[in-house]
């Protein structure tokens, strides 16, 4: 881990609103001091999220030596102008040695922070983060090698036609046909900007494939830009109206995602404005709360009742279930009993706009073994008619090919799709300060 850079030897006064969430730059490299702009990538010095306790001016540290982050505690008095621009390890104070994370004891700083502040500075779920578990701590797709044809199995000539079409829900009255076995996964309007959602929908349409709404409701301009639109219904049922089902080509229930399952979600009232509020069916400036599970729905029969109603309204579009990879076989059995035409399985490595790190870093089976288990279970049940979609940490064509070889019928893409429209993987989607503007609403 790098040491922070001394940005200045004096604090800066900023005006804060009570309850406002900001992210203080801890690395000293941001060009938007004292707040984060994503420049911490690769330093190991993630920004510090905090909520303003009161409205008014606050003096925030710019020397990055404070023992009371993000606020100035006078530590800059021991620095000189010659220190500006240089890395400097926080020195703590004369009474105690400051804790420093090491490979042997990587959690020591975190434990000290909890001991000093409890959850006051990080919220009741603890530290938050965005995107998925970093790829370098996951099983590697690069460790899987392809077995190619030569004699025992004859290769095809380059002029031979090869089918790439994917049929979602072949048993449905109106199966959804995609030109390629890839589509854009669920990412909500509100987590992504309107411009990003429309760009992704337009690109998917040009490629002959689809895009998912995400749990935040259907953005009309996004749906109009794509003729293969998947509608996701999650526990909060944001923006759901039966009449919309005649405009979509597939529908699925969201049980969970690889980075966050069983905990619900919260979009603060200050972010529920304008079109975001309208699409979600909420009054402006009210908290958008997603409960941990669907209220009033418990059994497969409960979900099948809604599924059959959607089929009736839509003329028979495919109905699916999005599952995080936890109780894989049992949850697949539940989905099948509820009449699933397709299953989207999100493994460990799957991303999110914001999740408690205690969830993101500690739940879900990694995508590679999760896929193998799901394929084996469906084959054992002789349910090859149910389309199996895998997602969670896949990035490149080689990853997609290997997933198909392992038994996926298709792949849903999130991070790679965002990166294709400009995401620089700053991993700060939850701050509303996305340097590429993709996960920013202002």
Range-by-range predicted roles:
Residues 25-27, 36, 61-63, 72, ...:
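Short cysteine clusters
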Residues 1-34, 38-60, 83-85:
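N-terminal pre-ligand scaffold of iron-sulfur
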Residues 52-75:
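Short Fe-S-cluster ligation motifs
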Residues 70-89:
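Short flanking/linker segments adjacent to small metal-binding domains or redox-active Cys/His motifs
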């Amino acid at each position: 881990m790098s040491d922070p850079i001394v940005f200045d030897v004096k604090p800066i006064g900023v005006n804060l609103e009570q309850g406002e969430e900001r992210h203080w730059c801890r690395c000293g490299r941001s060009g938007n001091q004292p707040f984060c702009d994503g420049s911490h990538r690769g330093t190991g010095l993630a920004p510090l999220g905090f909520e303003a306790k009161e409205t008014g001016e606050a003096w925030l540290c710019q020397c990055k030596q404070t023992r009371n982050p993000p606020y100035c505690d006078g530590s800059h008095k021991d620095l000189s102008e010659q220190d500006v621009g240089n890395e400097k390890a926080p020195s703590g104070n004369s009474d105690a040695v400051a804790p420093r994370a090491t490979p042997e004891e990587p959690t020591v700083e975190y434990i000290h922070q909890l001991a000093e502040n409890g959850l006051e500075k990080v919220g009741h779920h603890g530290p938050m983060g965005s995107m998925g578990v970093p790829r370098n701590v996951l099983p590697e797709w690069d460790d899987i090698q392809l077995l190619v044809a030569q004699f025992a199995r004859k290769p095809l000539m380059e002029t031979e036609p090869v089918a790439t079409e994917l049929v979602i829900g072949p048993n449905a009255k109106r199966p959804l046909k995609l030109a390629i076995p890839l589509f854009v996964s669920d990412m909500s309007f509100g987590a992504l900007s309107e411009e990003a959602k429309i760009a992704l929908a337009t690109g998917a349409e040009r490629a002959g494939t689809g895009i998912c709404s995400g749990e935040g409701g259907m953005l009309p301009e996004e749906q109009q830009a794509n003729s293969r639109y998947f509608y996701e219904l999650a526990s909060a049922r944001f923006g759901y109206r039966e009449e919309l089902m005649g405009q979509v080509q597939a529908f699925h229930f969201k049980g969970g995602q690889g980075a966050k399952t069983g905990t619900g979600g919260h979009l603060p009232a200050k972010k529920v404005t304008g079109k975001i509020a309208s699409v979600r069916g909420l009054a402006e400036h009210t908290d958008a709360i997603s409960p941990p599970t669907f209220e009033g729905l418990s059994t497969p029969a409960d979900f099948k009742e809604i599924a059959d109603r959607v089929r009736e309204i839509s003329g028979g579009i495919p109905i699916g279930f999005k599952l995080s990879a936890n109780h894989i076989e049992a949850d697949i059995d539940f989905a099948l009993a509820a009449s699933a035409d397709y299953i989207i399985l999100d493994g460990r490595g799957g991303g999110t706009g914001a999740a408690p790190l205690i969830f993101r870093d500690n739940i879900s089976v990694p995508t590679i073994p999760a896929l193998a288990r799901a394929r084996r279970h469906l084959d054992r049940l002789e349910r090859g008619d149910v389309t199996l979609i895998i997602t969670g940490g896949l990035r490149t064509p080689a990853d997609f090919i290997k997933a198909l070889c392992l038994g996926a019928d298709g792949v849903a893409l999130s991070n790679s799709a965002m990166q294709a429209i400009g995401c620089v993987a700053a991993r700060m989607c939850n701050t509303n300060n996305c340097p590429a503007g993709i996960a920013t609403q202002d």
